[in-house]
Design a protein with these regions (language model features):
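M16 family metallopeptidases and their MPP-like homologs
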Residues: 1, 53-55, 59-147, 159-167, ...
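C-terminal regions of mature proteins
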Residues: 1-45, 53, 225-230
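An aromatic/glycine/proline-enriched structural segment found at the starts
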Residues: 4-16, 188, 220-221, 225-286
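Histidine-acidic residue clusters that define the catalytic metal-binding segment
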Residues: 25-44, 183-224, 254-261
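Residues that act as N-cap/strand-start positions at coil-to-secondary-structure junctions
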Residues: 36-38, 108, 265
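Short acidic-hydrophobic surface loop/beta-edge motif
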Residues: 42-47, 269-272
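Peptidyl-prolyl cis-trans isomerase
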Residues: 147-150, 206-208
Length: 286
């Protein structure tokens, strides 16, 4: 095929024909699958049932820890959807020894980060630290995990922020598409048909006691997996994680998921939003 391209010569644009031997009338054959070599890793289980997986990665002097508690949105009753996400937001606030601002200042001094998030199937605590500052960062992680302080003022503020975000999303094409797609795929009444952030009417009735109970009942050892990746050996990191044995040694019962709609034919759904600056497309099936 031939393509025309304009080129500049002494300030004047000249048309030059570019010859291409690529056949665009047929799909090219896929190349060989790349060989993926998994790094060596180690596994262990603490006395309270926590599974830990780790791998040495010494390219840069950092350590990353990811704590994943199964549950999240799945542990919520339908009338209080958004509880897991709101609890995670509250855990990012004050602790027994630090205000939220002071906690972030300490992290900044260390060049570290700690965050708590909740999704459709779990709550995750993520930590990143320079190797030389690992001990100090782990002390802050322990503080965040065991000494988070929940206050009515924080609940009111964070709940209102979430509600305002949900209201704003009603005008965003991407959010509209995601919300409609979830309900079509999973069906009304399915937990995954609702955003983990919850809905306005469910958020409004969540109490401080709900937050406290959810934190205590969901962050338990039997649903926790820990991943450690970074510039540290197994025999060095495990003693530093001894504080994890203080996590309650108990499990929780995850609710069974209802069946999803059976889709037997291709169907096109159109959401008309006049003057929208962009279009969104979602394609999928269960």
């Amino acid at each position: 095929s031939q393509l025309s391209r304009l080129e500049s010569s002494n300030g004047n644009l000249e048309e030059r024909v570019v010859v291409s031997a690529f056949d665009r009338s047929s799909q090219p054959q896929a190349g060989p699958s790349p060989l993926v070599i998994m790094p060596e890793y180690w596994e262990t289980t603490l006395d309270n049932g926590i599974d830990i997986i780790g791998a040495l990665s010494d390219e840069i002097p950092t350590v990353n820890i990811r704590m994943s508690f199964d549950g999240g949105h799945l542990l919520e009753s339908p009338e209080k959807y958004g509880l897991a996400s709101l609890t995670a937001d509250m855990m990012n606030e004050n602790t027994g020894n630090f205000t939220s601002e002071a906690f972030e200042i300490e992290l900044d001094k260390l060049g570290s980060s700690i965050s708590v998030t909740a999704g459709s199937q779990g709550t995750t605590i993520s930590m990143r630290s320079l190797s030389r500052n690992l001990d100090a960062t782990l002390e802050l992680l322990e503080e965040r995990l065991f000494s988070s302080v929940f206050t009515e003022d924080d609940l009111i503020r964070l709940r209102q922020q979430t509600i305002e975000s949900i209201e704003a999303d009603k005008e965003e094409p991407s959010s509209i598409a995601a919300n409609v797609y979830r309900e079509l795929i999973y069906g009304a009444g399915h937990p995954f048909a609702v955003s983990p952030a919850g809905e306005i009417d469910t958020l409004e009735i969540i109490t401080l006691e709900d937050i406290q109970n959810f934190s205590r009942q969901s962050l338990v050892s039997q649903v926790l997996d820990v991943i450690v990746i970074g510039d540290i050996e197994q025999d060095e990191i495990l003693p530093k994680l001894d504080f994890l044995t203080n996590i309650p040694n108990q499990g929780i019962e995850l609710v069974g998921l209802p069946s999803t709609p059976v889709i037997t034919e291709n169907t096109l759904y159109l959401i008309d939003k006049p003057l929208a600056p962009q279009s969104e497309i979602r394609i999928g099936h269960m």
